[in-house]
UniProtKB/Swiss-Prot annotation:
Enzyme Commission number: 2.4.2.9
Lineage: Bacteria, Pseudomonadati, Pseudomonadota, Gammaproteobacteria, Pseudomonadales
NCBIfam families attached to this UniProt entry: PRK00129.1, upp
Note accompanying the cofactor annotation: Binds 1 Mg(2+) ion per subunit. The magnesium is bound as Mg-PRPP.
Entry GO MF terms: GTP binding; magnesium ion binding; uracil phosphoribosyltransferase activity
Family: Belongs to the UPRTase family.
Sites where the protein binds uracil: I193, G198, D199, A200
Source organism: Ectopseudomonas mendocina (strain ymp)
PANTHER family tied to this protein: ADENINE PHOSPHORIBOSYLTRANSFERASE (PTHR32315), URACIL PHOSPHORIBOSYLTRANSFERASE, CHLOROPLASTIC (PTHR32315:SF4)
Protein name: Uracil phosphoribosyltransferase
Database matches in CDD domains: PRTases_typeI (cd06223)
């Protein structure tokens, strides 16, 4: 499925603010949550609806609800946690499945060190969240894990994506749609996205200098 770059004015504005070298941890964290919520709006726009009747202020009224689609949000630790509250603000009933994937900074290869999946995950829509899609290794490893657990409907939401990461995911899992706020230029020799956001995990958690 094609990657979708969501070019909504609010998203473009907020991503622009996130690129500032001098952004504070507080502002970066808040913006990550806000853009995460806006991407959720796009990633769930095809969920089926069903009608039902409630008692309104003037009597019975027909309203709609999402038709029995169970959802799990899958943050890739640790940076994915920075988008989680924004996503859950729109789908508060979703279960959270945590997946820990670490990248070897020399080889840039990913390995999974933690998986805590929601019950009945094989019948759920899985929304993977991770601020950066760089080499694609962490995303591919997470999708591999979810498919092994029986997931059939998987979508990925990232703040910024590199063409190299998109290509890796599309080659390994062409059935998974990627929703991103920005497709950036390239990866540098260290596997960082250019122009990118810097190290999103460090900026969300305030663990290193802002220009890391």
């Amino acid at each position: 499925m094609p990657t979708r770059e969501i070019r909504h004015p609010l998203i473009r504005h907020k991503i622009g603010l996130m690129r500032r070298a001098d952004i504070s941890t507080k502002n970066f964290r808040e913006l990550a949550q806000e853009v995460g919520a806006l991407l959720t709006y796009e990633a769930t726009n095809d969920l089926p609806l069903e009608s039902y009747e409630i008692e309104g202020w003037a009597g019975a009224v027909q309203v709609e609800k999402i038709a029995g689609k169970k959802i799990t949000v899958v943050p890739i630790l640790r940076a994915g946690i920075g988008m989680l509250d924004g996503v859950l603000s729109l789908i508060p009933g979703a279960k959270v499945s945590a997946v820990g994937v670490a990248r070897n900074e020399e080889t840039l290869e990913a390995h999974t060190y933690l998986e805590k999946l929601a019950p009945e995950i094989d019948s759920r829509l899985a929304l993977i969240i991770d601020p950066m899609l760089a080499t694609g290794g962490s995303m591919v490893a997470t999708i591999d894990l979810l498919k092994k657990a029986g997931c059939k409907d998987i979508r990925a939401m990232v703040l910024v994506a590199a063409p190299e990461g998109i290509k890796a995911v599309e080659q390994a899992h062409p059935d998974v749609t990627i929703f991103t706020a920005s497709i950036d230029q390239r990866l540098n020799e260290h596997g960082y996205i250019i122009p990118g956001l810097g190290d999103a995990g460090d900026k969300i958690f305030g663990t290193k200098q802002k220009d890391a």
